[in-house]
């Protein structure tokens, strides 16, 4: 079902809570804003947050002869979304599955979803390097994974886990497109000045260590958090923000890497 997808990008993080799903959703919206047809696949089975972030909770998944039909965010069908969150009756319901059942579900997401022609498929993964990640890489062997974006925060404890993620990518032959440092500094909602709360430049030093591109540094911006629960892009709502600037840079970087 991935034959019609031109470019597949996996978004990874070594630790949970670094804003990986927010980066995935806003990157998808930014790509759509730039005229691309985009798919967003949420394979974080135990913590699916994409339906909430895009305001799609309660939407139903339908079955057709070719497989599951993803949820579209707009009538023009320029952004398609698939998540186990659409299959749960309540958002609070836990997914209590052992590894084999998780593996089977991820394989079904990657082989039985009817994606139409897409320029990009963004795969939002759970944190770490678990069965889910190995299953994704195995399923993508035939069509190929075109690269990974790694999201981290500047704290040393998060950077340690990202180093493991980098090693995982190298061992599974995934091309690292770059590292995004998230939650670096706090943007005051009143004066928009940025204050470093945690350590800073961890993403830059890590990118230098791994010899991969540093795609940008995102601050904690309360204005971005307000956009959760909608399909509004930062590029539309906050065009002058640092977040919009970094996302635009990432999109331009992807344009230079991939022939769309």
UniProtKB/Swiss-Prot annotation:
It holds the Pfam family ParA. Its cofactor is [4Fe-4S] cluster. The keyword Nucleotide-binding applies. CDD domains: Mrp_NBP35. It is found in: Cytoplasm. ATP binds at residues 14-21. Keywords: 4Fe-4S, ATP-binding, Cytoplasm, Iron, Iron-sulfur, Metal-binding, Nucleotide-binding. One of its GO terms (cellular component) is cytosol. Gene3D superfamilies: P-loop containing nucleotide triphosphate hydrolases. Transmembrane segments: none annotated. The keyword Cell wall biogenesis/degradation does not apply. [4Fe-4S] cluster binds at residues 188, 191. InterPro entries: Mrp-like_CS, Mrp/NBP35_ATP-bd, NUBP2/Cfd1_eukaryotes, P-loop_NTPase, YlxH/NBP35. Binds 4 [4Fe-4S] clusters per heterotetramer. Contains two stable clusters in the N-termini of Nubp1 and two labile, bridging clusters between subunits of the Nubp1-Nubp2 heterotetramer. SUPFAM superfamilies: P-loop containing nucleoside triphosphate hydrolases (SSF52540). Signal peptide: none annotated. It comes from the Eukaryota. GO terms for biological process: iron-sulfur cluster assembly. One of its GO terms (molecular function) is ATP binding. Heterotetramer of 2 Nubp1 and 2 Nubp2 chains. Component of the cytosolic iron-sulfur (Fe/S) protein assembly (CIA) machinery. Required for maturation of extramitochondrial Fe-S proteins. The Nubp1-Nubp2 heterotetramer forms a Fe-S scaffold complex, mediating the de novo assembly of an Fe-S cluster and its transfer to target apoproteins. Belongs to the Mrp/NBP35 ATP-binding proteins family. NUBP2/CFD1 subfamily. HAMAP family: Mrp_NBP35 (MF_02040), NUBP2 (MF_03039). This is Cytosolic Fe-S cluster assembly factor Nubp2 homolog 2.
């Amino acid at each position: 079902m991935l034959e019609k997808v031109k470019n597949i990008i996996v978004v990874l993080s070594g630790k949970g809570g670094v804003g990986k799903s927010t980066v995935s959703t806003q990157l998808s919206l930014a790509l759509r804003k730039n005229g691309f047809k985009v798919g967003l696949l949420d394979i974080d089975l135990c913590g699916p947050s994409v339906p909430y972030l895009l305001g799609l909770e309660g939407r139903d998944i339908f079955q057709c002869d070719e497989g599951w039909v993803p949820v579209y965010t707009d009538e023009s069908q320029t952004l398609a979304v698939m998540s186990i969150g659409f299959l749960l009756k309540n958002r609070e319901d836990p997914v209590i599955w052992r590894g084999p059942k998780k593996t089977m579900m991820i394989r079904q997401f990657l082989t039985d979803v009817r994606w139409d022609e897409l320029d990009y498929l963004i795969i939002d993964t759970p944190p770490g390097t678990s069965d889910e990640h190995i299953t994704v890489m195995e399923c993508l062997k035939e069509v190929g994974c075109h690269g990974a974006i790694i999201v981290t925060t500047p704290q040393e404890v998060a950077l340690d886990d990202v180093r493991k993620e980098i090693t995982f990518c190298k061992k599974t032959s995934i091309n690292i497109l770059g590292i995004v440092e998230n939650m670096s500094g706090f943007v005051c909602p009143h004066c928009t000045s940025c204050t470093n709360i945690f350590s800073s430049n961890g993403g830059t030093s890590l990118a230098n260590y791994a010899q991969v591109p540093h795609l940008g540094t995102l601050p904690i911006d309360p204005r971005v958090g307000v956009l959760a629960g909608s399909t509004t892009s930062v590029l539309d709502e906050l065009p002058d923000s640092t977040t919009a600037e970094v996302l635009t840079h990432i999109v331009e970087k992807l344009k230079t890497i991939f022939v769309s």
